[in-house]
Amino acid sequence: MTGKKAVVILSGGLDSTTCMGVGKEAGYELYPISFHYGQRHDREIENAKKVASYFNVTEHKVFSLEFLKEIGGSSLTDQSMEVSQEGVGEDVPNTYVPGRNTIFLSIAASYAEAIGAEKIYVGVSAVDYSGYPDCRPEFIEAMQQTIYQGTNANPAMTIEAPLIDLSKGDTVKLGMKLNVPYHLTTSCYLGGEEACGECDSCRLRLQGFEEAGATDPIKYM
């Protein structure tokens, strides 16, 4: 281990787990963080813990952000709304959680500064999530500038979004090359013991494995 530290925003899903593999390959000591924010698919936290254990991390923090449920405005935090199954398009889907990635990256930056980490890994993909405003390169660049201006980190920490230009198929190929434990992950928005296979997240995941010529190791209904 080189002594270099990196914070990884870890949801327990395919993308963030791939980022764990990327960070490990780059020689970083990984410090994953996960979030309870009243999401209907909070099962993902248990998956995140399994992934963190697989990578034998020094510490895995889970932060509570229940106020995001109080804010509402998303089918992921409001049980009265149905999860969108319309597919990824130009419109913002109702699974978008207002301000979520802004808050996640702000907390990640605070934690990274406190522990002296030089990298923050986040698994956003502008290609697959074209409808999510906080998955665009412009957003990541803006948050990078915010971190430069608003922290006392020395050296300045940088946000790494290694999947930003990758399709889901390319992401799966990368993860397989890095021996990422996809069998420990979950992507389903409904949060059941078995993935639904119908929500946008499940469909993108299945499409990714198909494009990669591989079989998804998790169970579907």
Swiss-Prot record:
Keywords, in A-Z order: ATP-binding, Ligase, Metal-binding, Nucleotide-binding, Queuosine biosynthesis, Zinc
Pathway: Purine metabolism; 7-cyano-7-deazaguanine biosynthesis
Cofactor(s) needed for function: Zn(2+)
Cofactor-binding details, from the entry: Binds 1 zinc ion per subunit.
Membrane spanning stretches: none
Gene Ontology BP terms: queuosine biosynthetic process
EC number(s) recorded for this UniProt protein: 6.3.4.20
Entry keyword Zinc: yes
Binding-site residues for ATP, renumbered to this chain: 10-20
Positions with a binding annotation for Zn(2+): 188, 196, 199, 202
Entries under CDD domains matching the protein: QueC-like
Catalytic activity: 7-carboxy-7-deazaguanine + NH4(+) + ATP = 7-cyano-7-deazaguanine + ADP + phosphate + H2O + H(+)
Subunit structure, as described in the record: Homodimer.
Function: Catalyzes the ATP-dependent conversion of 7-carboxy-7-deazaguanine (CDG) to 7-cyano-7-deazaguanine (preQ(0)).
Homology family: Belongs to the QueC family.
Protein's recorded name: 7-cyano-7-deazaguanine synthase
Source organism (scientific name): Oceanobacillus iheyensis (strain DSM 14371 / CIP 107618 / JCM 11309 / KCTC 3954 / HTE831)
Lineage, top ranks: Bacteria, Bacillati, Bacillota, Bacilli, Bacillales
